[in-house]
């Protein structure tokens, strides 16, 4: 009976891994396509399309943004809604429920955010580009799990769960950073209205309201309020996800609003929204000049060293110390080699790093440098991480 309950709790994690690992492969393909187009004769058409303005609504009740902004500010709100639901699910029923389970991935995620941010800040100290310190903090779970699924087919489930939990905590950290540090001038009226709507979502949850359309309407209204408030509108997606009804046990969870939304939106986010985001944001011109410029550019150096080196030091270092001090223990059948391989894969920033870079820089040259370096660092992390998992013999090795 105990094992049955345990498996029920683990199943959402393993299903999530299946979706995200498959999505990572699609994401890689879309990023490559975008880079090829941006470096071909179709580059002008590509840029014209993503910068074409689309207006939704009528007169005073309308929103007008470029296709790129509709993707980054609109579609990505759905991606963040899925992230919010995942975080809530894992806090209530999953690997983030108890301190014992949480301490290792949470500490690893914090280490994996702090060290890269410090490295970036050292390269860009006392320069305007220091605003990009949040870029190397992120881990792209789809890419990381995609690589792991390709080269680590015999990897223990514990390392999959560890990497997934770490990435979820990492996403939560990125959300907090975006909300606090990447916010423009605040419109307090819009923000207060948004918070009132969020309280209404919480109240509907407490009253056990199960009408999905009510939550959809609340979610759209919340997004509009945050769009007008100056706080990045994707935060509305997170708040909606955290506020949805989830149930008190696994049986109630299976019929909850959150479960129904997650069931529909997770594949939509993984296989449509994130690939569209990759197509719209990965189209950068790469040539000898841009690559040589990236070698000496403080933005590029901060991001590359932050993601490729900082993530390894932060994730593996924090985990190793906790295990050595016996504050935490490694998951079943997971060794220090698995842990190090996962730490390297944590340096695949991509989606969230690209997203934060678009918030950090308005100047095209700095943004291009950031995008090039994110791709370089992600390729290095993916290749090195894949090599580690490829050569590991998955046996019962001595724990750290």
Swiss-Prot record:
GO cellular component terms given for this protein: plasma membrane
Reaction equations catalysed: Na(+)(in) + 2 H(+)(out) = Na(+)(out) + 2 H(+)(in)
Function: Na(+)/H(+) antiporter that extrudes sodium in exchange for external protons.
Example GO BP: regulation of pH
Similarity-based family: Belongs to the NhaA Na(+)/H(+) (TC 2.A.33) antiporter family.
Compartment annotation: Cell membrane
GO molecular function annotations of the record: sodium:proton antiporter activity
Protein name per the record: Na(+)/H(+) antiporter NhaA 1
Transport found in the keyword field: yes
Organism (species): Clostridium beijerinckii (strain ATCC 51743 / NCIMB 8052) (Clostridium acetobutylicum)
Alphabetic keyword roster: Antiport, Cell membrane, Ion transport, Membrane, Sodium, Sodium transport, Transmembrane, Transmembrane helix, Transport
Stretches that traverse the bilayer: 25-45, 67-87, 103-123, 130-150, 159-179, 184-204, 213-233, 264-284, 303-323, 339-359, 372-392
